Amino acid sequence: MRFHGFHAATLAVLAVLAAHPAVAKTISVSSTTPDANEKLQEALILAKPGDIVQLGAGVWKLVDGLSLDVANVTVRGAGAGEGGSILDFTGQQGAGEGLLVTSDDVYLTNFAVLNTKGDGIKSKGADRIVYHKLRVEWTAGPKETNGAYGIYPVESTDVLIDSVFVRGASDAGIYVGQSKNIVVRDSIATENVAGIEIENSYDADVHDNIATKNTGGILVFDLPSLPMQGGHNVRIFENIVNDNSTPNFAPKGNIVASVPTGTGVLVMANRHVEIFDNVLADNGTANVMIVGYRYEHKDAKYQPLPRDIVVRGNQHGKAGYAPAFEGGAQIA
């Protein structure tokens, strides 16, 4: 794996955090005890900085969302696949997240979150957070009633998303919003509306991922009327972005509801974006689209046009054969 440019130092710091979390004690929880759900949330509440919350192999049938507000805690499962540590929210009451993290220096690894009513795993204001070897999935496939986001860090600095799998999100599978110093790598996003989305964020590297069978593969947006604006310095490289052919199933009114089926990479109103060394193929609308924000808004400081966009050295396969926008049939 090659490190590229100014993100190498950030990535090195995050790698140290991922490999060597400070250890005070290990709190082991099991899915087989009668009060398994309560014990799991209790462990997240009572953990001290440096602790590891160790999830045993098994399935938790959860009706309420979980939360973590303690800094420097590792939540580690026994695997994200079958036979691993599965947090199943099929019976969840309400529409909240599966897991909400609001503390710094948290390391999440080796477990799965299924069928949440709201977002899968969300972190807010959580700096130096690592999402590693996680699976977030809506197992019935694409549905408008699925949760909006799978992996969802927002308002954070130093974010590493590494080797995750997300399927079925009704907005974005992997979404990073209003954040800075971001790495998304070695992950798979499939059958979401947007596979990977970087929104209103600074200094992001998105590389060595697979975005396939989404409505749109990788999106880089900057939107008006948000606290953090002027998204810039985003690099999309060495990804496979192919066959993004899933019909758009976002709820009406969502910004991604306007993404045409068959979009590979879409840049909207961002600045300083590089798209290079990717494999782009079988995206019916276009492999790459660079567009302005065309909706009415009242934000006087907002810049709706993209600037300083570089597209180079990509491997292009078949594309543009079924553009899913008004007038597309006439130009295909």
Describe the residue ranges of each PLM region:
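Short, T/G/N/S-enriched strand-turn elements that build extracellular solenoid repeat scaffolds
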Residues: E38-L46, K61-V70, K122-G125, G230, ...
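Bacterial N-terminal signal peptides that target proteins for export
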Residues: M1-T10
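N-terminal signal peptide c-region/cleavage motif recognized by signal peptidases
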Residues: A19-P21
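Extracellular beta-strand/beta-solenoid scaffold signature
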Residues: L40-Q41, V63, D88-L99, N115-K122, ...
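Right-handed parallel beta-helix/beta-spiral solenoid domain characteristic of secreted/periplasmic
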Residues: S28-E38, I52-Q54, N72-G118, A140
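Right-handed parallel beta-helix
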Residues: G50, R76-A78, D104-N115, D127-A140, ...
